[in-house]
Amino acid sequence: MMKCNSIGSILFLTLGVMLSALLPCSGQQNAELPADATVEPSRTIPIMYISTADGKPIVSKEEYKRATFYITDPAKEVSLGTATAPLEMNIRGRGHSSWKADKKPYRLKLDEKLSLLGMPKSKHWALLKFWAPTMAGMKLGELIGMAWTPSTRPIEVVLNGEYIGLYLLTETIRIAKSRVNIYEQPDLNEEAATIPGGWLVEVDNYREDNQIRFRENDRWIINITHHSPKRLSTAQKEWLTAEFKGLNSDIYAPDKATSRWEERIDVDAMARFFIIQEVMDNPDGFHGSFYLHKDLGEDSKWVAGPIWDLTCMNREKTDYTFRMTASYVFAPHWIGELLKDDDFNSAVGKVWQEVYPTLSNEWLNYLEKCFAPYEAAYRQDKLRWAEAGVTTQPLHSVAEKLTTSLRRNVDWFNAHLPATPNAITPVVLTTDSRHIVYTMSGEVVRISDDYDEAIRDLPQGVYIVGGHKVIVP
């Protein structure tokens, strides 16, 4: 028998039941939100039609859902499947912070290897939110000579009969002949001779189960997520931990002239990776989505890349990007130490001399033209996900602003190459002048010489700053 001593309590409970029936339950929080579901595709570029087997939204990032798909193309060049004869696949959500948005990103696993929109055959693909810096950055990676850079193509998407906007259909990062083309080490490998090769890892800013962690320096922890192999034997985990602790020690060696990090890392590839992050002005460059891979072989080294998750700050650069993000929550791993090494700086200068003409001509010319075909699709996407009171710019304005920023970044970097008279001199802050933000477990999440900047926009939680507890509600 319910014990309730007031009519008000009964009304409160009744109202709660009524509201719970009207609002999404916790298991539905990641369902697609309606926004303006009456908007139609522009039909000016290819459209992917996806239908889940049960007709329901994709709400999980862990569990795949059976689905079918087909692609129509107004130019009739890359159509695939039909409405009456669709192709089979699995689909799930993907991403970290991007999964929390109304417009969701997805991971696709086809039943058979197929070429989508002219890209090399594979079963594995991603649908990412359309983002102009991603298109610009992937083209940059291709032109600058990374070992492999994911291809990406704009496409409109209709899910279960509802238009969900403009996406980038993108190759996912994985070991394969047409992608990261190296030996693939099996999970739970115990064979000592093959453990040192066939690795695909990521310096990550998120905690994952398939990860090793250790203290990089006295300021922050480094997370190394092992994507392949994903499940490690004791021998594999011990080797990977020792390998990266050794590599970290070499990078932080006080005497850079005798440091041995170059015996472990491909210097040329790291120089190219650094240039991409600087030209893009990508604040995430060295603390998340920082991939490395290593083939099997006596002389194999860790190779930086592939690139992923690129952005552009659209600001006036006054320093190297990783230094301009001093108040950012996550740490720029290794790059500050690498720039103290003359060999690395020389490698950066050599690569820049090679790629600068291409960047200042071919890349910037590409940026001035590449977005025009997607103007109508971009407009429909913005109508589909319109926010009340928010005015959005047309794609040509977004592209013009991005191109202007990237051209300015190219010019700035050309005038401030490492180890040249115009290079920026590092500013070393003494401990007394710094405000260091610690988690309750002792990890450093931010360092700033200004207290307000140190605590600005911290995620919800409890922190220690200057010996005092700071609670962010």
Predicted feature locations:
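Bacterial N-terminal signal peptides
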Residues: 10-21
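Boundary at the C-terminal end of the N-terminal hydrophobic targeting segment
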Residues: 21, 25-29
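Low-complexity, Pro/Thr/Ser/Gly/Ala-rich linker/spacer regions in secreted
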Residues: 28-40, 417-432
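Conserved NTP-binding catalytic cores of kinases and kinase-like/nucleotidyltransferase enzymes
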Residues: 28-139
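Middle-to-C-terminal accessory/interaction subdomains
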Residues: 45, 56-58, 87, 101, ...
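Internal "kinase-insert"/substrate-recognition segments embedded within catalytic cores
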Residues: 112-115, 129-131, 145-150, 162-275
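Short, well-structured beta-strand/strand-turn elements
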Residues: 144-156, 282
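C-terminal outer-membrane/trafficking sorting elements
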Residues: 423-473
